[in-house]
């Protein structure tokens, strides 16, 4: 990593109640909240659980303190030079801490949130899976990241630590809680779920009544190259991933975005661009081209501007909608692929990335 922050966070402690207040409140829909046994939660309305965002309601804080339960907190561990991006450390009851990112825009804020404690898919270009998968985040833990990132959040991207579709039930429950009209009433059109593409889960997602945005981390045009870049996805055929994603797009009448990380000498040839164009021809799809965000110890390189331009032009000539995506927060290791699983002191968990250049 460009800079591994190591901050003491004494207020992030192990909770006496593992579920914590999130398990009793932020992890519930309004109907579930209304059905709680009388006295289980203080005299707080469902909406008050989410507003104001920055701090939990005082009555909820006092109630939690009287029972020896600490509310999870979000601690800032980095801010980029322009002040547009902030990296946060979200402490968990079991001693782990996942990273979230707040991105400021002129028309609101974007919350980049995590869905798992670690990741099982070991993407070659990403720091988040270096320690493997420890556990899934609960719906309340997912929702609480958004709540603590502040009232100006109007876009949510599941692009932090973890594979959202590998935690399907809790992620979908979190989205429903965020959408609940009696709570945050968050528009689903402001929610983007980014996934490597698990065909079975994509088929299930197709039947959900959720008008979210879907991004598929594709990154290759052949199974061989994708298996090298995303070892955990070897059992998911590339063609089936694309087919399921496009079926979702047709079902919901909205385009699916395919993210493509352009890596020199690996997947950046004109032949790759032509294969990608052929793969997506006449599909309700668009492409986001991305540059690699450096991670310490990973033998990859950022693609030169000229190669990226040639790749983009090839797609445009084939009439495939394409943009080059700009990434915020790279100078504080808060960009895509740079988030680490940490402990409560802010130290990275698990092994560092493998040394050496990918061949």
Curated annotation (Swiss-Prot):
The similarity annotation says:
Belongs to the radical SAM superfamily. RlmN family.
Q: Is Oxidoreductase included in the keywords of this UniProt record?
A: no
Q: Give the primary localization class.
A: cytoplasm
Which Cys-Cys disulphide bridges does the record give?
A: 112-336
Q: Which residues does the record give as S-adenosyl-L-methionine binding sites?
A: 162-163, 194, 217-219, 293
Q: What is the lineage of its organism?
A: Bacteria, Pseudomonadati, Pseudomonadota, Alphaproteobacteria, Hyphomicrobiales
Q: Where in the cell is it found?
A: Cytoplasm
* Cited PROSITE patterns: RADICAL_SAM (PS51918)
The Gene Ontology terms for molecular function here are: 4 iron, 4 sulfur cluster binding; metal ion binding; RNA methyltransferase activity
The record's free-text note on cofactor binding: Binds 1 [4Fe-4S] cluster. The cluster is coordinated with 3 cysteines and an exchangeable S-adenosyl-L-methionine.
Query: Can you say what this protein is called?
Result: Probable RNA methyltransferase RPD_2859
Query: By its UniProt entry, which Pfam families does this protein fall under?
Result: Radical_SAM
Report residues binding [4Fe-4S] cluster.
Answer: 119, 123, 126
- Please list the residues that make up the active site: 99, 336
Q: Name one GO biological process term.
A: tRNA methylation
């Amino acid at each position: 990593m460009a800079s591994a922050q190591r901050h003491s966070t004494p207020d992030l402690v192990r909770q006496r109640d593992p579920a914590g207040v999130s398990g009793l409140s932020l992890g519930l829909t309004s109907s579930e909240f209304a059905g709680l046994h009388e006295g289980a939660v203080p005299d707080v309305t469902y909406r008050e659980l989410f507003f104001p965002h920055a701090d939990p309601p005082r009555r909820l804080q006092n109630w939690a303190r009287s029972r020896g339960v600490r509310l999870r907190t979000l601690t800032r561990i980095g801010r980029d030079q322009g002040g547009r991006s902030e990296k946060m450390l979200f402490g968990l009851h079991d001693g782990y801490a996942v990273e979230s990112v707040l991105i400021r825009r002129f028309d609101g804020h974007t919350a980049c949130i995590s869905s798992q404690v670690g990741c099982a898919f070991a993407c070659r270009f990403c720091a988040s899976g270096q320690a493997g998968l420890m556990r899934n985040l609960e719906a309340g833990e997912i929702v609480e990241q958004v709540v603590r990132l502040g009232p100006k959040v109007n876009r949510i991207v599941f692009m932090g630590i973890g594979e959202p579709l590998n935690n399907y039930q809790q992620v979908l429950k979190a989205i429903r809680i965020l959408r609940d009209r009696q709570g945050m009433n968050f528009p689903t059109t402001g929610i983007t779920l980014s996934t490597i593409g698990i065909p079975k889960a994509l088929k299930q997602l197709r039947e959900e009544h959720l008008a979210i945005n879907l991004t598929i981390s594709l990154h290759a045009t052949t199974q061989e190259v994708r298996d090298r870049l995303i070892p955990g996805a070897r059992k998911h055929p590339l063609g089936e991933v694309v087919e399921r994603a496009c079926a979702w797009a047709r079902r919901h009448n909205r385009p699916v975005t395919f993210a493509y990380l352009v890596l020199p000498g690996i997947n950046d040839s004109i032949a790759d661009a032509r294969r990608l164009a052929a793969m997506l021809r006449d599909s309700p799809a668009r492409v986001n081209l991305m540059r690699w965000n450096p991670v310490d110890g990973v033998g990859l390189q950022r693609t030169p501007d000229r190669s990226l331009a040639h790749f983009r032009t090839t797609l445009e000539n084939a009439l495939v909608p394409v943009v080059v995506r700009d990434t915020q927060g790279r100078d504080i290791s808060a960009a895509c692929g740079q988030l680490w699983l940490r402990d409560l002191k802010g130290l990275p968990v698990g092994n560092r990335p493998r040394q050496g250049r990918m061949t």
